């Protein structure tokens, strides 16, 4: 989903800014997003509170003004960039914007990879212990963000759902898992249960039926 408005910018003292080798890729990233309509270039204010309403024109001077603003720097407190609703903090003295609404920008270091999804029904041993847990394993996806939704007979299920945070695998792709905890009666009272995984706009759904497992 495209952001309605957005900013990539940075106000930082020259001595704290990135060197020329870091500037060019980040500047080109910002200009590419502008060219593809993913980002409306905005000028970061020189002082005071962030003002998302100041737009940058197409003049040469405006493009020059973008030079020092189309930059992204990692937060010194964290290993990876983090977004907040009002922008992106790097050094204490500098405020960098990443889309006005806090949308995360991922710079891909490798090709995208769709997840492999496997859905396991409750085991017979677990059912005998008066429990029923469905396990949805999600592996080999990149970048490392997925959304998981559970359904019973096509209707959303919210209660009893626990999803882990994606973790990096040895192949630099990501894996996660999601669990749906039920009672044996709940498990047997529906025709089917589904685990729906959405990654980068594509959805993979796996379904299991209690009758197939009896």
UniProtKB/Swiss-Prot annotation:
Instruction: Map out region (C region) in residue numbers.
Output: 110-214
Does this UniProt record's set of keywords contain Manganese?
Answer: no
Location in the cell: Secreted
Keyword Signal assigned: yes
Tell me which positions the record assigns to the signal sequence: 1-35
* GO CC terms: extracellular exosome; IgG immunoglobulin complex
Source organism superkingdom: Eukaryota
Keywords from UniProt, A to Z, are: Disulfide bond, Immunoglobulin domain, Secreted, Signal
Domain (Ig-like C1-type) ranges: 115-209
Cite the GO molecular-function annotations of the record.
antigen binding
Q: Where is this region: J region?
A: 98-109
* Tissue specificity note: Contrary to IGLL1, not expressed in pre-B-cells.
Report disulfide bridges, numbered on this chain. 136-195
Alphabetized InterPro entries for the sequence? Ig-like_dom, Ig-like_dom_sf, Ig-like_fold, Ig/MHC_CS, Ig_C1-set, MHC/Immunoglobulin
Biological process terms in GO annotation: immunoglobulin mediated immune response
Q: Give the CDD domains listed for this entry.
A: IgC1_L (cd07699)
Q: Which PANTHER family match?
A: IG-LIKE DOMAIN-CONTAINING PROTEIN, MHC CLASS II-RELATED
Q: Tell me more from the record.
A: Located within the immunoglobulin lambda locus, but does not require somatic rearrangement for expression.
- The protein's name in its UniProt record: Immunoglobulin lambda-like polypeptide 5
**Protein source organism:** Homo sapiens (Human)
